[in-house]
A protein has these predicted regions:
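Conserved, well-structured core segments that form the ligand-binding/active-site neighborhood
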Residues: 1-50
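Extended hydrophobic packing segments that form well-structured cores
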Residues: 146-195
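Short, ordered loop/turn segments at secondary-structure junctions
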Residues: 15, 59, 92-94, 146-147, ...
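C-terminal catalytic subdomain
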Residues: 64-142
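Short acidic, glycine/serine/threonine-rich loops at helix termini
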Residues: 20-26, 66-67, 92, 99-103, ...
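Solvent-exposed alpha-helices and their adjacent loops that cap or buttress functional pockets
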Residues: 1-4, 45-49, 79-81, 133-136, ...
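A short, acidic, amphipathic alpha-helical segment used as a generic capping/interface helix at domain edges
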Residues: 34-43, 72-76, 124-133, 161-171
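Structural motif
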Residues: 52-57, 88, 178-179
Length: 195
């Protein structure tokens, strides 16, 4: 955008109900910054410290229709989770990974060629797949989902079809836990930390 002289931009900010909340227009950078401030004001929730565990729902269908869509919840809530912490993600994922090619990237991840291959043949689903794998390296991600455990195991994600097995693995006893019912529209942040 910076290459175009006198670029005028309109930024729309939606609320959690996906209704128009605010509009910012003008110089591309200034209107974008104002929109970012509005998003921060609308969606940020201050927390006193990072949690050992976050239990988050994507917010139901269509926000949890696939791992591709559910990534938004992981992105949002990780700012409130300690490194190495546990994320319990409630995501039906009735459409599996989402785009057909999402799980096609597994072999590249397992063989260690993911990043190089993605640089050669970039796709957004490939990028989201890589992002999910990298998140699974930073956090213990346990999902209550319809996705088969063996499908996501190579990514480092753990899938469960029943809450009892999941919670046994999560071991919540004695941990600082945040529960976020609509993780796709909530961004926890420790006061004073920047994203």
């Amino acid at each position: 955008a910076g290459l175009v002289k006198n670029l005028y931009m309109v930024n729309l900010v939606l609320n959690a109900e996906m209704l128009l909340s605010e509009i910012y227009a003008g110089h591309y950078l200034k209107s974008w910054e104002k929109a970012c401030e509005a998003v921060d004001r609308i969606y940020r929730v201050d927390v006193p410290e990072r949690a050992d565990m976050i239990i988050a729902s994507c917010g139901g269908y269509p926000k949890d229709m696939s791992l591709y869509q559910g990534t938004k919840t992981i992105d949002n809530v990780e700012s409130g989770l300690k490194p190495g912490g546990t994320l319990v993600l409630l995501i039906e994922a009735r459409e599996g990974g989402g785009p057909a090619e999402y799980f096609d990237w597994i072999q590249n991840w397992v063989s260690g060629t993911m990043e190089a291959r993605l640089r050669e043949h970039f796709t957004v689903p490939g990028y989201i797949f890589l992002l999910n794998c990298e998140q699974a390296k930073r956090y213990n991600i346990l999902m209550l989902t319809s996705v088969a455990p063996e499908t996501v195991a190579p990514m480092g994600l753990k899938a469960f079809s029943d809450i009892e097995s999941l919670m046994k693995c999560a071991q919540p006893e004695g941990k600082k836990i945040y529960v976020i019912p609509n993780g796709s529209t909530v961004v926890p942040r420790v006061k004073g930390e920047s994203l």
